[in-house]
Amino acid sequence: MTKAQDRILVQEHLAHQAEPKPLSASEKADLEARIKVALKEKDAVLVAHYYTDPDIQRLAEETGGCVADSLEMARFGNQHPASTVVVAGVRFMGETAKILNPEKKVLMPTLEATCSLDVGCPADEFSEFCDQHPDRTVVVYANTSAAVKARADWVVTSSCAQAIVEHLDAKGEKILWAPDKHLGGYVQKTTGADVLLWDGSCIVHEEFKYRGLEDLKALYPDAAILVHPESPDAVVQMADVVGSTSQLIHAVQTLPNEEFIVATDNGIFYKMQQLAPNKTLIEAPTAGNGATCRSCAHCPWMAMNGLENLLHVLEHGDQEVHVDDELREDALRPLRRMLDFTANMNLKAAGNA
Protein backbone atom coordinates (compact mmCIF):
# COMPACT_ATOMS: atom_id res chain seq x y z
CA MET A 1 0.00 0.00 0.00
CA THR A 2 1.44 3.39 -1.01
CA LYS A 3 1.41 6.39 1.31
CA ALA A 4 -1.24 8.08 -0.87
CA GLN A 5 -3.43 4.97 -0.82
CA ASP A 6 -3.00 4.73 2.95
CA ARG A 7 -4.12 8.32 3.46
CA ILE A 8 -7.12 7.94 1.12
CA LEU A 9 -8.18 4.78 2.97
CA VAL A 10 -7.99 6.57 6.32
CA GLN A 11 -9.94 9.57 5.00
CA GLU A 12 -12.66 7.32 3.57
CA HIS A 13 -12.93 5.47 6.87
CA LEU A 14 -13.24 8.70 8.85
CA ALA A 15 -15.90 10.08 6.53
CA HIS A 16 -18.32 7.39 7.72
CA GLN A 17 -17.72 7.82 11.45
CA ALA A 18 -19.52 10.12 13.86
CA GLU A 19 -18.35 11.64 17.12
CA PRO A 20 -20.72 11.72 20.13
CA LYS A 21 -22.97 14.77 20.28
CA PRO A 22 -22.25 17.48 22.92
CA LEU A 23 -24.10 16.96 26.20
CA SER A 24 -25.40 19.38 28.80
CA ALA A 25 -24.17 19.16 32.40
CA SER A 26 -27.44 17.57 33.52
CA GLU A 27 -27.35 15.03 30.69
CA LYS A 28 -23.79 14.09 31.63
CA ALA A 29 -24.68 13.69 35.30
CA ASP A 30 -27.64 11.45 34.46
CA LEU A 31 -25.61 9.28 32.09
CA GLU A 32 -22.73 8.94 34.53
CA ALA A 33 -25.06 7.87 37.35
CA ARG A 34 -26.70 5.25 35.13
CA ILE A 35 -23.32 3.99 33.90
CA LYS A 36 -22.09 3.50 37.47
CA VAL A 37 -25.16 1.42 38.28
CA ALA A 38 -24.81 -0.61 35.07
CA LEU A 39 -21.14 -1.37 35.72
CA LYS A 40 -22.05 -2.90 39.08
CA GLU A 41 -25.03 -4.81 37.72
CA LYS A 42 -22.98 -6.29 34.86
CA ASP A 43 -19.91 -7.08 37.02
CA ALA A 44 -17.98 -4.88 34.62
CA VAL A 45 -14.85 -2.76 34.89
CA LEU A 46 -14.11 0.27 32.70
CA VAL A 47 -10.61 0.56 31.24
CA ALA A 48 -9.86 3.83 29.41
CA HIS A 49 -6.93 5.14 27.42
CA TYR A 50 -5.26 8.48 28.17
CA TYR A 51 -6.51 9.82 24.82
CA THR A 52 -10.22 9.36 25.55
CA ASP A 53 -12.53 12.16 26.68
CA PRO A 54 -11.87 13.46 30.23
CA ASP A 55 -15.41 12.44 31.26
CA ILE A 56 -14.63 8.83 30.32
CA GLN A 57 -11.27 8.91 32.11
CA ARG A 58 -12.77 10.35 35.28
CA LEU A 59 -15.57 7.79 35.25
CA ALA A 60 -13.09 4.92 34.92
CA GLU A 61 -11.20 6.16 37.96
CA GLU A 62 -14.33 6.76 40.03
CA THR A 63 -15.63 3.23 39.41
CA GLY A 64 -12.49 1.28 40.23
CA GLY A 65 -11.27 0.92 36.67
CA CYS A 66 -8.11 2.40 35.26
CA VAL A 67 -6.80 5.06 32.91
CA ALA A 68 -3.56 3.99 31.30
CA ASP A 69 -1.45 3.46 28.21
CA SER A 70 -2.10 0.38 26.09
CA LEU A 71 0.39 -1.82 27.96
CA GLU A 72 -1.08 -1.05 31.38
CA MET A 73 -4.62 -1.41 30.00
CA ALA A 74 -3.73 -4.92 28.86
CA ARG A 75 -2.25 -5.79 32.23
CA PHE A 76 -5.15 -4.35 34.22
CA GLY A 77 -7.84 -6.12 32.23
CA ASN A 78 -5.92 -9.37 32.54
CA GLN A 79 -5.60 -9.14 36.32
CA HIS A 80 -8.97 -7.63 37.32
CA PRO A 81 -11.59 -10.11 38.63
CA ALA A 82 -14.58 -8.55 36.79
CA SER A 83 -16.33 -10.88 34.34
CA THR A 84 -16.80 -8.08 31.80
CA VAL A 85 -14.16 -5.61 30.63
CA VAL A 86 -15.34 -2.43 28.91
CA VAL A 87 -12.54 -0.94 26.84
CA ALA A 88 -12.80 2.77 26.04
CA GLY A 89 -10.22 3.26 23.34
CA VAL A 90 -9.75 1.90 19.84
CA ARG A 91 -10.44 -1.52 18.39
CA PHE A 92 -7.01 -3.08 18.74
CA MET A 93 -7.19 -2.41 22.50
CA GLY A 94 -10.47 -4.32 22.73
CA GLU A 95 -9.03 -7.17 20.68
CA THR A 96 -5.96 -7.30 22.92
CA ALA A 97 -8.17 -7.48 26.00
CA LYS A 98 -10.12 -10.38 24.45
CA ILE A 99 -6.95 -12.21 23.41
CA LEU A 100 -5.65 -12.04 26.97
CA ASN A 101 -9.04 -12.77 28.54
CA PRO A 102 -10.96 -15.25 26.35
CA GLU A 103 -13.21 -16.25 29.25
CA LYS A 104 -14.36 -12.66 29.82
CA LYS A 105 -16.88 -10.62 27.89
CA VAL A 106 -15.12 -7.65 26.30
CA LEU A 107 -17.24 -4.68 25.25
CA MET A 108 -16.45 -1.36 23.63
CA PRO A 109 -18.59 1.81 23.35
CA THR A 110 -18.17 1.40 19.59
CA LEU A 111 -16.42 -1.22 17.48
CA GLU A 112 -15.94 1.40 14.74
CA ALA A 113 -13.17 3.17 16.67
CA THR A 114 -10.03 2.05 14.89
CA CYS A 115 -6.56 3.51 14.28
CA SER A 116 -4.76 4.78 11.18
CA LEU A 117 -1.86 2.45 11.98
CA ASP A 118 -4.22 -0.52 12.03
CA VAL A 119 -6.06 0.59 8.87
CA GLY A 120 -2.74 1.18 7.09
CA CYS A 121 -1.39 -2.31 7.80
CA PRO A 122 -3.74 -4.87 6.21
CA ALA A 123 -2.98 -8.39 7.41
CA ASP A 124 -2.70 -9.94 3.94
CA GLU A 125 -0.26 -7.32 2.63
CA PHE A 126 1.74 -7.45 5.84
CA SER A 127 1.97 -11.24 5.70
CA GLU A 128 3.34 -11.02 2.15
CA PHE A 129 5.89 -8.46 3.35
CA CYS A 130 6.99 -10.85 6.10
CA ASP A 131 7.26 -13.73 3.63
CA GLN A 132 9.68 -11.65 1.57
CA HIS A 133 12.02 -11.33 4.57
CA PRO A 134 12.04 -14.71 6.34
CA ASP A 135 15.39 -14.00 8.01
CA ARG A 136 13.97 -11.19 10.16
CA THR A 137 12.29 -11.29 13.55
CA VAL A 138 8.84 -9.73 13.17
CA VAL A 139 8.11 -7.02 15.76
CA VAL A 140 4.76 -5.24 15.58
CA TYR A 141 3.43 -2.29 17.51
CA ALA A 142 0.35 -2.91 19.64
CA ASN A 143 -1.63 -0.59 17.32
CA THR A 144 -2.41 -3.46 14.94
CA SER A 145 -5.16 -5.98 14.31
CA ALA A 146 -5.24 -9.41 15.91
CA ALA A 147 -4.41 -10.88 12.49
CA VAL A 148 -1.24 -8.80 12.20
CA LYS A 149 -0.23 -9.69 15.76
CA ALA A 150 -0.72 -13.36 14.88
CA ARG A 151 1.94 -13.01 12.17
CA ALA A 152 4.45 -11.49 14.60
CA ASP A 153 7.16 -12.88 16.84
CA TRP A 154 6.86 -9.97 19.29
CA VAL A 155 4.30 -7.29 20.10
CA VAL A 156 5.55 -4.04 21.66
CA THR A 157 4.15 -0.77 22.97
CA SER A 158 5.97 2.56 22.88
CA SER A 159 6.93 2.12 26.54
CA CYS A 160 8.81 -1.15 25.98
CA ALA A 161 9.76 -1.11 22.28
CA GLN A 162 13.30 0.14 22.80
CA ALA A 163 14.12 -2.40 25.51
CA ILE A 164 12.75 -5.33 23.50
CA VAL A 165 14.57 -4.35 20.31
CA GLU A 166 17.80 -3.89 22.30
CA HIS A 167 17.30 -7.40 23.67
CA LEU A 168 16.78 -8.85 20.19
CA ASP A 169 19.67 -6.90 18.70
CA ALA A 170 22.00 -8.21 21.43
CA LYS A 171 21.09 -11.71 20.24
CA GLY A 172 22.10 -10.77 16.70
CA GLU A 173 18.56 -10.73 15.33
CA LYS A 174 17.51 -8.50 12.44
CA ILE A 175 14.13 -6.82 12.84
CA LEU A 176 11.10 -6.38 10.58
CA TRP A 177 9.07 -3.58 12.17
CA ALA A 178 5.47 -2.51 11.62
CA PRO A 179 3.49 -0.41 11.28
CA ASP A 180 4.66 3.03 12.56
CA LYS A 181 7.72 4.17 10.62
CA HIS A 182 8.41 7.09 12.95
CA LEU A 183 8.45 5.01 16.12
CA GLY A 184 10.37 2.30 14.29
CA GLY A 185 12.90 4.83 13.03
CA TYR A 186 13.33 6.22 16.53
CA VAL A 187 13.92 2.74 17.94
CA GLN A 188 16.33 1.98 15.11
CA LYS A 189 18.31 5.14 15.80
CA THR A 190 18.45 4.72 19.59
CA THR A 191 19.35 1.01 19.55
CA GLY A 192 21.50 0.78 16.43
CA ALA A 193 19.59 -2.36 15.45
CA ASP A 194 19.09 -3.56 11.88
CA VAL A 195 15.43 -2.60 11.35
CA LEU A 196 13.36 -2.88 8.17
CA LEU A 197 10.37 -0.52 8.40
CA TRP A 198 6.78 -0.84 7.20
CA ASP A 199 5.53 2.52 5.87
CA GLY A 200 2.78 3.48 8.32
CA SER A 201 2.06 6.48 10.52
CA CYS A 202 -0.37 7.94 13.06
CA ILE A 203 -2.56 10.67 11.57
CA VAL A 204 -2.38 12.68 14.79
CA HIS A 205 1.34 12.53 15.55
CA GLU A 206 2.41 12.92 11.92
CA GLU A 207 0.79 16.36 11.87
CA PHE A 208 3.19 17.86 14.42
CA LYS A 209 5.57 20.20 12.59
CA TYR A 210 9.16 21.18 13.31
CA ARG A 211 8.83 24.77 12.09
CA GLY A 212 5.79 25.53 14.21
CA LEU A 213 7.37 23.84 17.21
CA GLU A 214 10.50 25.94 16.77
CA ASP A 215 8.38 29.12 16.70
CA LEU A 216 6.44 28.05 19.79
CA LYS A 217 9.64 27.30 21.67
CA ALA A 218 10.78 30.85 20.93
CA LEU A 219 7.61 32.12 22.64
CA TYR A 220 8.11 29.80 25.62
CA PRO A 221 11.90 29.45 25.94
CA ASP A 222 11.73 27.86 29.40
CA ALA A 223 9.20 25.21 28.40
CA ALA A 224 10.27 21.59 28.16
CA ILE A 225 9.23 19.89 24.92
CA LEU A 226 7.60 16.48 25.38
CA VAL A 227 7.23 14.32 22.26
CA HIS A 228 5.70 10.92 21.57
CA PRO A 229 7.99 8.86 19.29
CA GLU A 230 5.21 8.38 16.74
CA SER A 231 6.04 11.96 15.69
CA PRO A 232 8.31 12.79 12.73
CA ASP A 233 12.06 12.71 13.35
CA ALA A 234 12.50 16.49 13.05
CA VAL A 235 10.00 16.95 15.89
CA VAL A 236 11.60 14.21 17.98
CA GLN A 237 14.97 15.92 17.57
CA MET A 238 13.64 19.01 19.34
CA ALA A 239 12.37 17.08 22.36
CA ASP A 240 13.63 17.35 25.91
CA VAL A 241 11.81 14.08 26.62
CA VAL A 242 10.74 11.42 24.13
CA GLY A 243 8.46 8.76 25.54
CA SER A 244 5.22 6.85 25.75
CA THR A 245 2.10 8.43 27.21
CA SER A 246 2.91 7.22 30.72
CA GLN A 247 6.52 8.39 30.38
CA LEU A 248 5.43 11.86 29.25
CA ILE A 249 3.03 12.12 32.19
CA HIS A 250 5.87 11.18 34.52
CA ALA A 251 8.03 13.90 32.96
CA VAL A 252 5.43 16.58 33.73
CA GLN A 253 5.35 15.40 37.34
CA THR A 254 9.09 15.22 37.87
CA LEU A 255 10.82 17.84 35.72
CA PRO A 256 11.38 21.25 37.35
CA ASN A 257 9.99 23.20 34.38
CA GLU A 258 6.77 25.14 34.93
CA GLU A 259 5.70 25.00 31.26
CA PHE A 260 5.52 22.08 28.85
CA ILE A 261 4.94 21.95 25.11
CA VAL A 262 3.26 18.60 24.52
CA ALA A 263 3.44 16.82 21.15
CA THR A 264 0.91 14.03 21.53
CA ASP A 265 -2.86 13.65 21.62
CA ASN A 266 -4.33 16.38 23.82
CA GLY A 267 -6.51 13.84 25.63
CA ILE A 268 -3.44 13.28 27.79
CA PHE A 269 -3.81 16.77 29.26
CA TYR A 270 -6.51 15.55 31.66
CA LYS A 271 -4.17 13.16 33.47
CA MET A 272 -1.20 15.52 33.27
CA GLN A 273 -3.18 18.37 34.80
CA GLN A 274 -4.63 16.06 37.44
CA LEU A 275 -1.19 14.91 38.58
CA ALA A 276 0.61 18.23 38.10
CA PRO A 277 -2.04 20.95 38.62
CA ASN A 278 0.48 23.78 38.90
CA LYS A 279 2.13 23.10 35.55
CA THR A 280 1.17 24.91 32.33
CA LEU A 281 0.52 22.66 29.33
CA ILE A 282 0.79 23.96 25.76
CA GLU A 283 -0.34 22.04 22.68
CA ALA A 284 2.39 21.51 20.11
CA PRO A 285 1.48 22.98 16.69
CA THR A 286 0.08 20.78 13.93
CA ALA A 287 -0.59 21.22 10.23
CA GLY A 288 -3.82 23.06 10.93
CA ASN A 289 -6.58 22.96 8.34
CA GLY A 290 -4.54 20.79 6.01
CA ALA A 291 -4.38 17.96 8.51
CA THR A 292 -6.04 14.61 7.96
CA CYS A 293 -7.43 14.58 11.49
CA ARG A 294 -10.80 16.16 12.18
CA SER A 295 -9.53 17.86 15.31
CA CYS A 296 -5.78 18.32 15.19
CA ALA A 297 -3.89 16.86 18.14
CA HIS A 298 -6.83 14.63 19.03
CA CYS A 299 -7.53 11.20 17.57
CA PRO A 300 -10.93 11.21 15.83
CA TRP A 301 -11.48 7.55 16.69
CA MET A 302 -10.72 8.03 20.39
CA ALA A 303 -13.29 10.84 20.27
CA MET A 304 -15.96 8.31 19.28
CA ASN A 305 -16.00 6.96 22.85
CA GLY A 306 -18.81 8.83 24.62
CA LEU A 307 -21.07 8.51 27.64
CA GLU A 308 -24.14 7.66 25.56
CA ASN A 309 -22.62 4.77 23.65
CA LEU A 310 -20.89 3.59 26.84
CA LEU A 311 -24.26 3.32 28.59
CA HIS A 312 -25.82 1.72 25.51
CA VAL A 313 -23.26 -1.08 25.33
CA LEU A 314 -23.60 -1.80 29.04
CA GLU A 315 -27.38 -2.06 28.72
CA HIS A 316 -27.48 -3.99 25.44
CA GLY A 317 -24.10 -5.72 25.11
CA ASP A 318 -24.19 -5.38 21.33
CA GLN A 319 -20.67 -4.01 20.81
CA GLU A 320 -18.87 -7.15 21.95
CA VAL A 321 -15.35 -7.98 20.78
CA HIS A 322 -14.90 -11.46 19.30
CA VAL A 323 -11.61 -13.03 18.21
CA ASP A 324 -11.48 -16.40 16.45
CA ASP A 325 -9.98 -19.08 18.73
CA GLU A 326 -7.17 -20.09 16.37
CA LEU A 327 -6.31 -16.46 15.64
CA ARG A 328 -6.38 -15.70 19.35
CA GLU A 329 -3.86 -18.45 20.11
CA ASP A 330 -1.51 -17.19 17.40
CA ALA A 331 -1.78 -13.56 18.57
CA LEU A 332 -1.41 -14.52 22.23
CA ARG A 333 2.14 -15.84 21.82
CA PRO A 334 3.82 -12.53 20.88
CA LEU A 335 1.67 -10.65 23.41
CA ARG A 336 2.73 -13.04 26.17
CA ARG A 337 6.36 -12.56 25.18
CA MET A 338 5.94 -8.81 25.66
CA LEU A 339 4.14 -9.12 29.00
CA ASP A 340 6.63 -11.66 30.35
CA PHE A 341 9.58 -9.56 29.17
CA THR A 342 8.26 -6.35 30.73
CA ALA A 343 7.36 -8.13 33.98
CA ASN A 344 10.91 -9.46 34.20
CA MET A 345 12.28 -6.03 33.31
CA ASN A 346 10.27 -4.44 36.12
CA LEU A 347 11.49 -7.06 38.60
CA LYS A 348 15.10 -6.29 37.68
CA ALA A 349 14.47 -2.55 38.00
CA ALA A 350 12.94 -3.07 41.45
CA GLY A 351 15.92 -5.17 42.46
CA ASN A 352 18.28 -2.36 41.47
CA ALA A 353 16.25 0.37 43.16
Curated annotation (Swiss-Prot):
Amino-acid positions noted as binding iminosuccinate in the UniProt annotation, renumbered to this chain: 49, 70, 141-143, 158, 228-230, 245
Compartmental location: Cytoplasm
Annotated signal sequence range: none
UniProt KW keywords: 4Fe-4S, Cytoplasm, Iron, Iron-sulfur, Metal-binding, Pyridine nucleotide biosynthesis, Transferase
Record GO terms (molecular function): 4 iron, 4 sulfur cluster binding; metal ion binding; quinolinate synthetase A activity
Binding-site residues for [4Fe-4S] cluster, renumbered to this chain: 115, 202, 299
EC annotation from Swiss-Prot or TrEMBL: 2.5.1.72
Superkingdom to which the source organism belongs: Bacteria
InterPro entries per the UniProt record, alphabetical: NadA (IPR003473), NadA_sf (IPR036094), Quinolinate_synth_A_type1 (IPR023513)
Pathway terms, separated by semicolons: Cofactor biosynthesis; NAD(+) biosynthesis; quinolinate from iminoaspartate: step 1/1
UniProt catalytic activity: iminosuccinate + dihydroxyacetone phosphate = quinolinate + phosphate + 2 H2O + H(+)
One Pfam family of this chain: NadA
One GO CC term on file: cytosol
Cofactor binding, per record: Binds 1 [4Fe-4S] cluster per subunit.
The protein's role, per its UniProt record: Catalyzes the condensation of iminoaspartate with dihydroxyacetone phosphate to form quinolinate.
Family: Belongs to the quinolinate synthase family. Type 1 subfamily.
Protein name stated in the entry: Quinolinate synthase
